[in-house]
Amino acid sequence: ITVMIVSARGEEFDKISGLDGGADDYVTKPFGVMELVSRVKVQLRRRETRSNPANAEKLTWGPVEVDTRYHRVTAQGALVELTLKEYELLVLFIKHPHQVFSREQLLNQVWGIDCYIESRTVDVHIRTLRMKLGLSSSIIETVRGVGYRLAEVPQVAAA
């Protein structure tokens, strides 16, 4: 289910509360009908991409595995419960393992180009994603002054 909040409450705290609470988008009044239609189309495209079994794959990075067909994440074999945005961040990182993403790039890729959210929201989501991954949290590196990327997977020496 895609959740879009349409509200007259436009304070940053209200927006972050709504998005952190699981909303996929937050639109404040006043807004244009064309803007709302465009935002709905974006959410429908994302939903189609996520729900299409032809696009399903298993992504692995070190001890973390993502099954995109069943929307399931495991770290060291244990199931990890993620919010939609945390999941989308992790998938983006794993699909582009050596790329450094700025906060702005992550906002555009995960929340959408028309999203008006403070860039620190990304930091909060990265922090909670790291906590949920537990011992695997070190796979997401902070690149000071730039953004975030996946850490190199340690190579296991052949016996």
Show the residue positions of the predicted features.
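Residue-level preference for alpha-helix termini and adjacent loops
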Residues: 12-15, 58, 63, 100, ...
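A generic "binding-loop/recognition-motif" signal
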Residues: 9, 65, 146
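Conserved active-site beta-strand element of glycosyltransferases/polysaccharide synthases
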Residues: 149-151
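Heptad-repeat coiled-coil signal-transmission/dimerization helices
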Residues: 33-36, 40, 69-70, 122, ...
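Positively charged, aromatic-enriched patches within helix-turn-helix-type DNA-binding elements
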Residues: 23, 72, 77-146
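Short, Lys/Arg-enriched segments at the junction into DNA-binding effector domains
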Residues: 42-100, 104, 153, 158
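His-Asp phosphorelay/catalytic-motif detector in bacterial-type signaling
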Residues: 1-2, 116
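Basic, amphipathic DNA-recognition helix from helix-turn-helix-like DNA-binding domains
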Residues: 2-60, 159
